[in-house]
Each structure stands twice: as C-alpha cells, then as structure tokens.
UniProtKB/Swiss-Prot annotation:
It is found in: Cytoplasm; Endoplasmic reticulum. Keywords: Acetylation, Cytoplasm, Endoplasmic reticulum, Phosphoprotein, Repeat, SH2 domain, SH3 domain, Translation regulation. GO terms for molecular function: cytoskeletal anchor activity; phosphotyrosine residue binding; protein-containing complex binding; receptor tyrosine kinase binding; scaffold protein binding; signaling adaptor activity; signaling receptor complex adaptor activity. This is Cytoplasmic protein NCK2. Ubiquitous. Adapter protein which associates with tyrosine-phosphorylated growth factor receptors or their cellular substrates. Maintains low levels of EIF2S1 phosphorylation by promoting its dephosphorylation by PP1. Plays a role in ELK1-dependent transcriptional activation in response to activated Ras signaling. Interacts with DOCK1, LIMS1 and TGFB1I1. Part of a complex containing PPP1R15B, PP1 and NCK2. Interacts with FASLG. Interacts with AXL. Interacts with PAK1, PKN2 and SOS1. Interacts (via SH2 domain) with EGFR. Interacts (via SH2 domain) with DDR1. Interacts with IRS1.
Amino acid sequence: MTEEVIVIAKWDYTAQQDQELDIKKNERLWLLDDSKTWWRVRNAANRTGYVPSNYVERKNSLKKGSLVKNLKDTLGLGKTRRKTSARDASPTPSTDAEYPANGSGADRIYDLNIPAFVKFAYVAEREDELSLVKGSRVTVMEKCSDGWWRGSYNGQIGWFPSNYVLEEVDEAAAESPSFLSLRKGASLSNGQGSRVLHVVQTLYPFSSVTEEELNFEKGETMEVIEKPENDPEWWKCKNARGQVGLVPKNYVVVLSDGPALHPAHAPQISYTGPSSSGRFAGREWYYGNVTRHQAECALNERGVEGDFLIRDSESSPSDFSVSLKASGKNKHFKVQLVDNVYCIGQRRFHTMDELVEHYKKAPIFTSEHGEKLYLVRALQ
C-alpha cells in the first residue's frame, strides 16, 4: 500500500479561482498530486483543490520527492496522460502563469534542438502526438512541465511522454563527475568543483523558510550549480559569499551560461523601450516583442508601482501580455485576441485602448488582503 503523504501549510492562502483551495498556516493536508507546479491536496473537510507548492511542505518520508514519481516507481513504468493538448486550455494553475490564467497552466521551454535516445516504444494516441520506436533517436524541440515533450522523428513532429526518452550529451560531459551527480539528483553541499550551469541575477528579495534554502536580496549575482530533477521549480545556487542553497527559479533571470564573469566584463541588460513596429507601434505603453524577463528588468530598473507595459505574448504570437509594476512581485496578465476582441479573464474589449482605460479606473488585480492594483501610467 502506498504511503499516505501529508503536507503542512506554511502560510495562509486564499483561493483565487474555483479549482483552488483555501488553506491556513499549519493546516494539515493530504497530498493527491504533485506532478505540476501547483499541488492538488485534500483538507480535513474532504474538500480538494490546488495550492501553490511553495506554500506547503511535506511532513513525512517523501520530502522533496515526487508523489507521482513514487507511484510510478511502485507500479512500474507509467506515463502521464494529457487530458488536453499542452497547447490547449488547462484548469491547472501555475506559479509562473500570467493572470488571469486562461491559457495552459504548464510552463514550456521552446526552440530546443536536443538529441534524445528512445528507451521505450510509444504508440501515439492523439493526432498531435509522436510515435516512438525503441532504440531510435529523436530531436527534442520543446519541453512542457506537465511531463510531455515535443520533438521530431523521421519527418514527423508531435508530443510524447518525456520519461520514454533519455537526453544525449557528448561523451566527455557524460563521464564528468558533475554531470553524473546532476543526473542522479545528488546533493552538492558546498559547490566546490561543481559545474556552473548559469549565471543569474535576482529579481526580488527572498527570505528562506527552511535550512536548505538561500536568502538573497534583489540584484545579487549567483551561480546555478544544480537543477534538482525531483524539484524543478528550485535551483541550487552559490552566491558571492560562497553560500549554497535552493532558490525559486522564478525569482532570478539568467544572464549567461557558464562561470561568472569578472564584474568589469559582466553582461549588461540593454535598454528596453516602446516599439516602433508591431500592432500598436507608437503607443507609449507598447513594447512589442520583448520577453517576460526583459519586461521584469525594465519595470524593476525604472518603474514605480502602477507603471505598466504591454508586450507580445511569448507563447501565443497573436496574443498579448500586460506587465505591471507591483510591490513585492510584478504581475503579468494574459490578453487573448479572439475574433478581434481583446479578452482578459471574463472581460472583453473592442480595442486595447479601451482595455487600458478600463483598468486605470477599475482594479486589474485584487490580492487576498484586499489590496487593489490599477494601471496607472505607461512605463517611462
């Protein structure tokens, strides 16, 4: 019989959507699914729902492990079935999701070109899936945090379960101790001699809750030395003082790959300003094709609370995102363009200007404590 996993709420959380669950600090909950960035839990009243995974911690022996992975290990090889395509709407929230979360709740990594070896045969069950032949090699083009990857084989492109393949690396890297330790999910206690994966800069201050986490202030530069396979939302980093610990990956921006550069040669973040091309070229709030990270940096460098910009969506070329400077953590809101109507949550607007003017007068976001956020002015 599989061990029942209990988690304890570290902070209060008030549900923002129907599929979420209210929790109170120190409340005892039963973990039902930890396969995504939000966990599904059950409370003492037998109510179930999703909560942010960093708001709870495991109480018993499966700490830092995956409930789904343990079930798979117990029952043998299994695959996570997608009830919808990774490109379709999903009811599962994500800690990295834009608000309101109308699109997929899964985080995705694009523009990859990684060879992978097929460990097990797989027969496609949907039109957008890819059949795999055991022993063959596929090219991974995209990764989705729901456990499915998109790749190509023999001219065909589609989705397949990621645990059916093994990424390939060059022979020298495969034999290195640092690579082997990362593959095994080994803990690097001091970072000495470990391979530096990225150099990152912190976007916000963070106070550790557990001994294995690392405190940091906004603007610090750190080295990423490990990406734990069983805890993908956290990276193990080493700061300038040599301290090592886990940090939430959505609190940092990648500056470069490899070891840190001398401060005199540190990469500089280029100026990001309004776009002279694109659908809303010339509008002071339209920044065009900039990334979420670029928007974050621009808002943090020269914005004040209420400053905003609108950019093209990274995941849906025809859609847009509103990035808003807020105290603590900036907010990002998905705007979908459907039949020439701009949709944000359940609201619809005929023009983007109409949307902007509406949220200058009505709150675009209300926190669990009743704090209201408005679009005040375009980022200067």
